[in-house]
Amino acid sequence: MAYFLSKLIPPRPTFVADMSAEERDVMLAHQDYWLPHINAGLVLVMGPVIDPKGAYGVMIVNTPSLKLLEEWEAQDPVILAGQGFAFENYPMPAVKVAPIEPLAPVSSISP
């Protein structure tokens, strides 16, 4: 298994602030599409990044291969809708992942 940062580039920098009702529906379908991957532990985190230069989406994905990730992305409703979204993928060769159930409380961490 390999980790990738997957960046979803919207059709315009202002997308998060001014998406249409149709675009909002596509985004909801996008979230629903990835939910089984999240539940299976393949997508560790997913959500929007509010960057002053333009918002975008990010996922950290644990998958057997980049090819499989690209196949999943090709079936994402945001891509199938043909509204100008695109994915960029970056390998993460040295990843440390917290356990799902923390072994110690946050208060145990010293500054």
Predicted feature residues:
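Conserved, structured core segments of small domains
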Residues: 1-111
